[in-house]
Amino acid sequence: MGLATFTSCEDESIAYDLEGTWEGRVFDYSEWDGTRYNISYSLLEFYLGAFRLVQGNGHWVDFYDRGPRDYVSYKIHWRVDNQVIYITFNEDGTQYRVTNYHLSDRRFWGTMYEYKNGQPQGYSHDFELRHTSSPNWDNYYSDYDYYWSNYGYGHYWSNEGVFETEDGTATSPAKSYSDTVVKTAPKRHLIEDNK
């Protein structure tokens, strides 16, 4: 007998509304090699996985004021389970759970809690993001590869604004951001109204 899994209609609706790009302030600063750098804003990209109704992958990009880089991008995996949104950073396994939130087609706000190895870290923060773009569904259905390449997966955008591919060729900047390869990622800090 096979195991069947079910997703709630609410979870599917939340995942559908979450898909796209959101901008706003979540983290206050990062520490990199003992130096503190202010984060001016963050950009979060959520994309549903193929044939997955309540989960997917994406990027979380922190933009810096006078930092060692203009921005740092992290790969994330996200899912909705029992109306809780789980965002996990692929690089270090840090997870943020979003609860007590409001999600519309324009705004997303709520409370974010930090977890590491499944254990709460004692940090929480109220945040607010605005919706800035959605996937181009016409391109998604007519040309699957174009959809993914349109968002720059597997590439990075340097500080000089040149978009470099993995084989070293350069093109114009992409519409979206992808991960910069960072040997030591900065430690992220929630804005200082921790509860």
Which residues does each PLM region occupy?
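C-terminal motif of bacterial Sec signal peptides marking the signal peptidase cleavage site
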Residues: 4-8
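N-terminal helix-cap/turn-to-beta initiation motif at the start of protein domains
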Residues: 9-23
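K/E-rich alpha-helical interaction surfaces of small helical-bundle regulatory domains
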Residues: 19-29, 74-75, 79-82
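Generic short beta-strand segments
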Residues: 23-31, 57-63, 109-116
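N-terminal glycine/threonine-rich, aromatic-flanked beta-hairpin/loop signature
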Residues: 36-84, 185-187, 191-192
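A structural signal for short, hydrophobic beta-strand segments that form beta-sheets
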Residues: 46-48, 98-103, 129
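Acidic, glycine-rich flexible loop segments
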Residues: 82-107, 113
